[in-house]
Amino acid sequence: MNHHTRPVLLVLGAGDRAYRSFLLQEFAARHHLVLLDDQVPAWTRPYVTDTVTVDLHDHQAVHRAVTEIALRQPITGVTTYLEHHVELVARLAKELGLPGADPDAVAACRDKARTRQLLAEHGVPSARSVLVNSADEAVAAAAAIGYPVVIKPRGLGGSAGVHRADYREHVSAHYDNAAAATLIGLEASAVAGVLVEEYLHGPEISVECAVRGRGDVHIAAITRKRLGSEPAFLETGHLVDATDPLLDDPALHHVVTSAIKAVGITTGILHVEVRLTRQGPRIIEINARLGGDLIPLLVHLATGISLPQAQAALATGDTPDLAGSVAQSAAIEFRYPTVTGPVQAAHARAFTADWLERLFWTRQSGDVVVAGPHSTINDRLAHAIVSGPTPDACQARLDQVMQSLTVHITSPVRTTACVR
């Protein structure tokens, strides 16, 4: 594509470099990017053509900024990879007459209570769920559903404030935790409330989907999730295999497609979380955005498919390229602290291998981290990404990399909230 003919794509929010630089890089491969953000990070400069500093929580200010941009140059699409801004992007696209998901459908994905309601109305397998507004209501809901239950915030993500409760005495504490949970500012735009839900037994996956019209859902990849010890549900790693047998599973495809139709999404890249129970696949959440935790990079390494480029194509009315060009596995593992306190030192032994795609420290000397069971994603010390011919090969390679890491932490100190 000629550099001068690339379409202009508005991007709302940059996010954290460790987790988001790959996405912005892929957007920039085929589009001129105009980035709008509260504060534009320096790391974004190689990827963007123009930047606009604006408070993204002030929607009127954003509308004025977008109007001014449109007067200077034609805008062909608007997108984001941040949960914070998916509703605003949908509204902007609708007002500008650009391709995009219906704002009400996107809002339904962000509101987990509304998601459950729509899934139930359309007969899509999910979890029984009750919206509660007090600890007493949570106790009553748990008794009605039956233990164990999951208690979670209505509008957050990243497993923030999500806990399993096996007994009545756990419910009140977990309710208070969910009601007070925060996640990198997401609570500012999230609908308030707490859900008490049926606990679903079985492994958890995410389904990375491209939606090209109502009921036209293409499953691009299956992500196998690794979760830490309950009662929390922290994600400790992910794996994508280009030949995962679930890619051709008709029951999974039916449930995921039915769920997306139920909430009303007709275009975009979605990250749908599913539990594989004995009764079949059941929906956990529907996210109207690219998956986090560098899952799109795993998909790219394992299959050759660029989900960010596919999202940008859909946002500008183009046909996404969803053809795979690679067939292998890729995996990520997150290193969490085993001790609470400030990081004194962190280093890795000299390590070179063509299958080590990435080793990134996300905490530095002096940073305070919290050990389980109170860890959040904010406490991740590092992550490693590897590729390999099979899932087993990837796991062996991750083990090798993780054994090369050394972290010294001074303890104890008081815990801190998730702020990343």
Provide a role label for each language-model segment.
Residues 1-105, 136, 364-370, 374-379, ...:
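ATP-binding N-terminal substructure of ATP-dependent carboxylate-amine bond-forming enzymes
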Residues 33, 121, 312-420:
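Peripheral (often C-terminal) accessory segments that flank ATP-dependent C-N-forming ligase machineries
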Residues 95-161, 183-185:
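A conserved helix-loop-beta module that forms one wall/lid of the active-site cleft
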Residues 119, 142-165, 183-202, 207, ...:
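ATP-grasp fold ATP-binding core
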Residues 125-127, 148-151, 166-202, 237, ...:
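Conserved ATP-binding module of the ATP-grasp superfamily
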Residues 132, 162-167, 210-212:
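Short beta-strand-to-turn element immediately C-terminal to the catalytic PLP-Schiff-base lysine
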Residues 163, 198, 241, 300, ...:
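Short, well-ordered beta-strand elements within core beta-sheets of diverse protein domains
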Residues 191, 198-265, 269, 276, ...:
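ATP-dependent carboxylate/phosphate-activation module, predominantly the ATP-grasp catalytic core
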